[in-house]
C-alpha cells in the first residue's frame, strides 16, 4: 500500500471521541464502518492515530480494540488531558489530580445546583479508572444512576462506587455534572459560574472540571515535545468546547456543522456531515490509498 498526502507531512492525528469519532444514535454509540476502514488504512500507512477524550483510559482502550489499532496507537489522552498514557512504554506521560481547593469548588457547585433544584448528578473519576457517584439530586436517584450508566455506553465497563465525601486518596482526575435534561448547562455556567473558567461544557448533558492547567491541548503539547513533532505534521478533529485547546495545535483542524461557533472559527474545514462520518470523510479527503 502506498500513501499520497494532499497535505504534505501529516503523520499525527488527534481525534475526539463523543460527537466526533463516535456518534450516539438510536440509543447506541457507533463508529461508521467507512470511518473504521479509514483509520485502519491510516495506521497501516505508518501514521499515528490518537484519541483525545474526556472519557477514562479503559474506554479509549476499548475503542482502540474496536478499531483494531490497539497494538499500533502510541498514546491515549483521557479525562480531557488529566491522563496521558504512553502505550509503548506502558507508563504515564502525564497524570494530574484535583486539589483540595477543587474539592471546595465541587461542593460549592453542588450547593448552588441544589438551590436551583436542577435534576443532576455529580460524578467523579479516579486515576485508576474508578467512577464515583458523589451527589445525585433527583427524585429517583437509582433511576438517574441507571440513566447515566446507559448514556456512558455499551463499550464502558464501569464499577460505580457511592461516596459521601471527597478524599485525596481517591486520586480524582475529573468531576462531571450530568443533567437529566439537555442544554441546561450553558445557561447555568453563564448565570452562576462566570468566574470559573475551568468549567467546560462537554456534551448536551454535562459540564466538567479538570485539574489546573489540564486540557487536551496541553496533552498534545506534551506528546509534541516527547516525539519532537511540529504543528505541520498534525491534524486535529473535534466537535465541542473541550476541543478548543486542541485546536490551538495542528495545521489541519476539522469539525462539523454542529460544533459551537468558536470551534468552527478555528477550523480549517467544517463538514456538513454527522459525527463519525465526517471523520472518515476528512481522513479520506487528505489521504489517498492505492
Curated annotation (Swiss-Prot):
UniProt-listed Pfam families: Hydrolase_3 (PF08282)
Cofactor(s) named in the record: Mg(2+)
InterPro entries: Cof (IPR000150), HAD-like_sf (IPR036412), HAD-SF_hydro_IIB (IPR006379), HAD_sf (IPR023214)
Sites where the protein binds Mg(2+): 16, 18, 239-240
GO MF term list: magnesium ion binding; phosphatase activity
Highest taxon in the source lineage: Bacteria
First-tier enzyme category under EC: hydrolase
Enzyme Commission code(s) on record: 3.1.3.-
Catalytic residue list: 16 (nucleophile)
Keywords: Hydrolase, Magnesium, Metal-binding
GO cellular component: cytosol
Coiled coil spans: none
Residues given in the record as phosphate binding sites: 17, 53-54, 216, 242
Alphabetized NCBIfam families for the sequence: Cof-subfamily, HAD-SF-IIB
Family: Belongs to the HAD-like hydrolase superfamily. Cof family.
Name of the molecule in the record: Putative phosphatase MPN_427
Source organism: Mycoplasma pneumoniae (strain ATCC 29342 / M129 / Subtype 1) (Mycoplasmoides pneumoniae)
Lineage: Bacteria, Bacillati, Mycoplasmatota, Mycoplasmoidales, Mycoplasmoidaceae
